[in-house]
Every structure is written in structure tokens, then in C-alpha cells.
Amino acid sequence: MPKPDIHPNWYPDAKVICNGEVVMTTGSTQPELHVDVWSGNHPFFTGTQKILDTEGRVDRFMRKYGMGSADAAADEKKPDAKNNNKDNTSKED
């Protein structure tokens, strides 16, 4: 006999939403499911090639921890070759 009141609520008509449109209904423990890709717009099922515009993990990390963008951090790490050559030259006496 299962314990009462420990199981999640079941929504037999949960809406699956992709790009602001309801694309299908299914059963779930959530009343609404928000997805980026589903079988109606996935390149494998549609036979087309599509580049998904999703945020990269590094950019998300940088934004989350307030470090600016990943591109700015990469630019800061690159030393200027002209300045390094001047600083690293030694005078021979």
C-alpha cells in the first residue's frame, strides 16, 4: 500500500511550450514544460539544418558570477606582443 500525501501532483494535460507556442500536451508532474527544441523543429526530424542560438556555458558562468563576458576575459588575458618585446629586451653592457 503506497503512503498517502507523498506523491507529486499529476497533470495529465500538461502543456509543452516551445517559443511561446503550445506545441503538444502530455502527462507530467509540472503543469507547463518550457523547451527549446522539440520534434517539430528539431533538424533530425525536419530534415533541415538549423543553428540553435543558445547561450554558451562559459558566457552563462561569466554573467552569473559577474565577471563580464567571456570575450572580454579572453581579451584581457592576451598580452600585447609589441609591448612585451620592448619590456623583455635587455641591454648588454
Swiss-Prot record:
Organism encoding this protein: Prochlorococcus marinus (strain MIT 9313)
PANTHER family: 50S RIBOSOMAL PROTEIN L31, CHLOROPLASTIC, LARGE RIBOSOMAL SUBUNIT PROTEIN BL31C
Entry protein name: Large ribosomal subunit protein bL31
Subunit relationships: Part of the 50S ribosomal subunit.
HAMAP family for the chain: Ribosomal_bL31_1
Pfam families found in the cross-reference section: Ribosomal_L31 (PF01197)
Gene Ontology BP annotations: translation
Known role: Binds the 23S rRNA.
Keywords linked to the UniProt accession: Ribonucleoprotein, Ribosomal protein, RNA-binding, rRNA-binding
